[in-house]
């Protein structure tokens, strides 16, 4: 069998309308989507959706498409305006995606739904061959097309402010729309809220007392043009640190100093050593010791920044890399920031902390009624000496359907009806709930699990459907009944 990516030449469709016709054919060949098979439910005169998804970024769209394929009624809520969901057109600052261009992403196994098909339909196969990596904003254009061509039911400008599971099989969603409250109900709710899905930026203590105008997190939606002429420090050496540093330099910062605690910048992305179907399908089946060992190892090795992102910084003569520099304190002095480090002080005008994200329930008021009851990995597992890891310890201990599970002794009926399809699911179930390489695997797995849960809950209804089914295969006129012949004497 020919390896993926080695094909001599795939068919190129002339324009998006032709591609969309081909996509419609592929879906028809696969008999997708399935007709709805779940019972219609209502509460207080309003419909109860089978599944409500919070977040219309890549993960939310992929899951919505997978659920619709399975004949499940779904609705998606996102607080962002249409076309601005996720980080791609807002807070992300990389020039191109870090993932290889050929990955299928959220295509769910459908060739005409891939980025490559979308790209070649518009620009041709020669342009595809010459493309190195996918431009960030072009990826967002693709996701907008993905949503439109599949007619996914996304409600923008809908900010979910509270989730309250009910004992009768519903989850109540409190939603704010244009400053006005509304309520909705669903049998299951899925959080597709991205990298910061159960919290927000991890903010180091040394900036906590500084005026907010003097520092930013790399995920903030700030105008870097305001950094023109300033001395800027960037804490960290990961991809987001490089993206922030490069953007500051391009916007005219006088100098940018990268302050890196480690004595060297990592060279190898160890996570790429597990990008194969065995890891995707097998990780969730591993015992706790192996899950912790794998994720802790990757955390301690850290992920290097992409080469092109690093060169985007280093090509500027006013970019300075300082390694082995741990920040001890930061104070305002004489209109500037005095940053004391393990190797000496430095004076800056502005500080950007590229310190990632953390599970922090205080930053997710939507989950305030659930957070005290959610079991975490620190409630489940004690790592061996030397393997403590705060990020892993705070991760939720999820079930096979990404569902939250209750802490021992807690009482929150319906908690298991809320599912965590975002980055903090990684320790429990693997890297299948947010990153491009395996997002289709995660979406399809979760859709299958949800379909199974809904069917089991509805077994009385489903059995009644079997009993009521009356479509004949034959009509009785295909034969003539006659008695057995007499025995021969």
Predicted feature descriptions by range:
Residues 1-2, 109:
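Accessible peptide chain termini
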Residues 2-80, 85, 128-239, 243-251, ...:
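Flavin (primarily FAD) cofactor-binding/catalytic cores of flavoenzymes
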Residues 92-125, 272-286:
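Flavin (FAD/FMN) cofactor-binding and adjacent substrate-gating region
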């Amino acid at each position: 069998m020919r390896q993926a990516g080695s094909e001599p030449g795939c068919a190129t469709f002339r324009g998006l309308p032709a591609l969309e016709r081909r996509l419609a054919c592929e879906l028809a060949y696969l008999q997708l989507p399935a007709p709805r098979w779940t019972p219609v439910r209502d509460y207080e005169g309003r419909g109860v959706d089978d599944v409500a998804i919070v977040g219309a970024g890549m993960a939310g769209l992929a899951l919505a498409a997978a659920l619709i394929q399975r004949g499940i009624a779904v609705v998606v809520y996102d607080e962002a305006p249409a076309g601005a969901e996720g980080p791609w057109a807002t807070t992300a600052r990389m020039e191109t995606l870090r993932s290889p261009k050929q990955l299928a992403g959220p295509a769910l196994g459908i060739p005409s739904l891939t980025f490559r098909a979308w790209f070649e339909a518009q620009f041709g196969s020669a342009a595809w061959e010459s493309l190195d990596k996918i431009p960030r904003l072009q990826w967002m254009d693709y996701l907008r097309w993905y949503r439109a061509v599949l007619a996914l039911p996304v409600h923008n400008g809908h900010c979910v402010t509270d989730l309250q599971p009910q004992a009768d099989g519903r989850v109540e969603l409190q939603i704010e729309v244009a400053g006005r409250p509304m309520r909705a109900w669903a049998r299951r709710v899925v959080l597709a809220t991205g990298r910061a899905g159960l919290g927000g930026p991890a903010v180091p203590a040394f900036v906590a007392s500084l005026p907010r105008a003097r520092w930013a997190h790399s995920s903030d939606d700030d105008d870097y043009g305001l950094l023109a002429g300033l001395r800027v420090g960037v804490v960290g050496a990961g991809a987001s640190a490089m993206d922030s540093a490069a953007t500051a330099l391009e916007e005219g910062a006088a100098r940018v100093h990268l302050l890196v605690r480690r004595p060297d910048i990592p060279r190898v992305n160890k996570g790429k050593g597990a990008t194969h179907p065995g890891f995707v399908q097998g990780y969730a089946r591993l015992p706790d010791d192996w899950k912790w060992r794998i994720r802790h190892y990757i955390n301690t090795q850290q992920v290097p920044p992409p080469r092109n992102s690093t060169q985007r910084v280093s090509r500027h003569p006013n970019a300075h890399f300082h390694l082995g520099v741990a920040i001890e304190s930061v104070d305002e002095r004489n209109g500037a920031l005095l940053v004391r480090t393990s190797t000496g002080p430095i004076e800056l005008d502005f500080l950007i902390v590229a310190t990632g994200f953390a599970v922090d329930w205080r930053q997710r008021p939507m989950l305030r009624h659930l957070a005290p009851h959610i079991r975490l990995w620190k409630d489940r597992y004690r790592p061996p000496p030397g393997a403590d890891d705060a990020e892993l310890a705070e991760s939720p201990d999820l079930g096979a359907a990404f569902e939250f599970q209750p802490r021992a002794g807690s009482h929150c009926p319906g908690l298991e009806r809320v599912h965590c399809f975002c980055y903090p699911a990684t320790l429990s179930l693997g890297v299948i709930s947010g990153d491009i390489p395996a997002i289709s695997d995660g979406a399809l797995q979760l859709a299958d699990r949800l379909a199974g849960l809904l069917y089991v809950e509805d077994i009385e209804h489903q059995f009644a459907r079997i009993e009521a089914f009356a479509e004949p295969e034959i009509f009785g006129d295909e034969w003539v009944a006659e008695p057995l012949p007499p025995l021969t004497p």
